[in-house]
């Protein structure tokens, strides 16, 4: 099975991607055009719609005929968590808001980009998938770990987070 996608994090307002935060109808039309064009040449291809998971993500949904699965971006950045939430968040706390917004489409959900950056204790807690009851996220089918240094600056002077799995925390990455 092959999956294609286009225009990830289209609902993001942070200005990191030139295609994000378009007028929703413009994005939907462009996404549908992409899928229609691909289907002509690769009819067996499936399509992943990959929002950031913001409150208005539904406005960017291109419709059930254009989405086979949903891919969410989920990142845990300790300095951001402490500033925005007053403390460290675990895997479930990071995923829940965007998952809850995406589950209403009743499509399989993947975390198409996942990473944690912070001290060893934070990264261990963030990566502990075994601490989550699978019943809490029944549509979640897989996770792709984004093990790289962020290519672009994060807002609010957070710099370029380092999402790489390191020897001191790789034993805490649990299935």
Predicted regions and their residues:
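Short loop/turn segments at strand-loop or loop-helix junctions that form parts
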Residues: 1-10, 73-75, 114, 146-148
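Aromatic-lined carbohydrate-recognition surfaces of secreted/lumenal glycan-active proteins
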Residues: 1-2, 31-58, 107-119, 145
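Short catalytic/ligand-binding loop motif for oxyanion handling, primarily in non-cytosolic enzymes
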Residues: 3-9, 56-58, 79-80, 118-119, ...
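Substrate-binding cleft/loops of secretory-pathway carbohydrate-active enzymes
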Residues: 51-73, 121-132
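Substrate-binding cleft of secreted/luminal carbohydrate-active enzymes
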Residues: 107-175
């Amino acid at each position: 099975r092959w999956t294609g996608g286009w225009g990830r994090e289209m609902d993001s307002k942070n200005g990191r991607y030139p295609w994000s935060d378009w007028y929703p109808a413009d994005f939907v039309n462009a996404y549908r055009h992409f899928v229609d064009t691909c289907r002509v040449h690769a009819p067996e291809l499936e399509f992943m719609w990959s929002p950031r998971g913001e409150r208005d993500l539904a406005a960017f949904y291109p419709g059930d005929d254009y989405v086979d699965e949903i891919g969410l971006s989920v990142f845990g950045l300790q300095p951001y968590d402490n500033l925005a939430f007053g403390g460290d968040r675990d895997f479930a706390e990071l995923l829940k808001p965007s998952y809850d917004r995406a589950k209403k489409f009743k499509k399989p959900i993947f975390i198409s980009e996942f990473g944690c950056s912070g001290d060893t204790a934070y990264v261990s807690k963030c990566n502990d998938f075994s601490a989550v009851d699978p019943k809490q996220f029944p549509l979640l089918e897989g996770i792709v770990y984004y093990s790289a240094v962020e290519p672009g600056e994060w807002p609010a002077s957070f710099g370029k987070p380092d999402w790489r799995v390191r020897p001191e925390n790789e034993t805490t990455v649990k299935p």
